[in-house]
A protein has these predicted regions:
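C-terminal active-site "lid" helix and adjoining low-complexity regulatory extension at the edge
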Residues: 156-178, 185-192, 201-242
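Flexible loop/turn segments at secondary-structure boundaries
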Residues: 45-46, 119-121, 207, 216-218
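Coil-to-beta-strand transition motifs
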Residues: 91-93, 103-109, 192-194, 203-206, ...
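ATP-dependent carboxylate/phosphate-activation module, predominantly the ATP-grasp catalytic core
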Residues: 65, 80-81, 87-89, 93-178
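Hydrophobic residue at the +6 position relative to the catalytic HRD Asp in the kinase catalytic loop
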Residues: 197-199
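Active-site ExK catalytic segment of metal-dependent nucleases
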Residues: 39, 76, 114, 210-214
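Active-site nucleotide/adenylate-binding loops and adjacent lid/helix of ATP-dependent enzymes
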Residues: 1-105
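Protein kinase-like catalytic core scaffold
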Residues: 36, 109-111, 207-209
C-alpha cells in the first residue's frame, strides 16, 4: 500500500526490492497454494491484477516492482478452483456472478446467475479483459445457451471454450446449491438490496471473492434473456413507480 504492507493491525515498510522479497516470502509461508493474488484496490474489471508465486518470486518482484511500490493492492491467497471447472479454463479462477435482490418483505432472492470464463492465458475471467459470460439456470446450476464475449472485445459467441474445446451448455456447476445458500446468508449483512456476488467453486465448496454494489447488470440482462420479462424485475419497477 504505497510502500507499506498492512497485515491485520501491523504496518511495515516495503520501500525496496529486498524488503518486498522478504515480506512476500513471509506471506507465502502462510499459504497452501504457494501463490498470492493481487488486485488494485481502486481497480475495476480485472485490470492490473497479478499473481505472485513462490516458484518465481524474484522474477515477479523485479517485473512488478514499480507498480508494487507506487500503487495499492489487496493481497489474497490464491484459490485452487474445482477440478472440473479447471478443465474448462485453468489459468483464471472462473467465477459465478450471482445477483441477489431483497424484496420489501426482507426476503432474499437470487435474481440471476451467470458464469464467466477466461480466455488464453489470462489470469482473470472478466469480460473487460477478454473473457466471456454464459447464463446459468438459477434453479439447477446448469450452463445454458452460448457464451458471449463483450462487443468491445470482438463479440464472439461460443458453444465450446475456444482453448480447451470443452462443451459449455449442459455443464453442471459443482456445489451450486451451496453457492446459492452462501449468497442468501451473506446478503443479510449488507444494506444494499441488489448486490452482485463473485463466487469461486473449490474442491470443498463455494467461496466469496467479492461483493459488487455496481454489478454490471447489462451482462446479467443478456444472460437472462431480457430482464424486462423477469417477474422480480417487474416487482422492482413497480415499487419505484416505473
Amino acid at each position: 500500500l504505497h510502500s507499506q504492507l498492512i497485515v491485520g493491525n501491523q504496518v511495515s515498510w516495503t520501500g525496496s526490492k529486498e524488503t518486498l522479497l522478504q515480506k512476500f516470502n513471509k506471506l507465502l509461508e502462510g499459504t497452501t497454494t504457494n501463490q498470492l493474488f493481487l488486485k488494485p484496490i481502486m481497480g475495476i474489471g480485472g485490470q492490473g491484477c497479478m499473481i505472485i508465486s513462490k516458484s518465481n518470486l524474484m522474477e515477479s518482484v523485479i517485473r512488478h516492482q514499480k507498480a508494487l511500490l507506487e500503487q495499492s493492492y489487496l493481497i489474497e491467497e490464491y484459490i485452487q478452483q474445482h477440478p472440473t471447472i479447471n478443465e474448462i479454463h485453468p489459468f483464471a479462477i472462473n467465477t459465478l456472478r450471482m445477483v441477489h435482490y431483497i424484496d420489501s418483505n426482507n426476503t432474499v432472492h437470487i435474481l440471476s446467475v451467470l458464469m464467466r470464463f477466461g480466455i488464453g492465458t489470462s489470469i482473470t475471467d472478466n469480460t473487460s479483459t477478454g473473457g466471456f459470460s454464459i447464463a446459468v439456470n438459477s434453479k439447477t446450476g446448469v450452463l445454458e445457451g452460448p457464451g458471449r464475449q463483450d462487443l468491445a472485445k470482438g463479440g464472439a459467441v461460443y458453444s465450446k471454450h475456444p482453448d480447451t474445446q470443452v462443451a459449455l451448455e449442459g455443464f453442471v456447476i459443482p456445489y451450486f446449491q451451496e453457492a446459492c445458500n452462501l449468497v442468501k446468508k451473506s446478503a443479510k449483512y449488507f444494506p444494499n438490496r441488489i448486490v452482485g456476488w463473485d463466487i469461486a467453486i473449490t474442491a470443498s465448496g463455494p467461496v466469496i471473492i467479492e461483493a459488487n454494489h455496481n454489478p454490471s447488470l447489462h451482462l446479467s440482462d443478456v444472460a437472462y434473456g431480457g430482464y424486462k420479462k423477469h417477474p422480480l424485475i417487474k416487482e422492482i419497477l413497480k415499487e419505484i413507480n416505473i
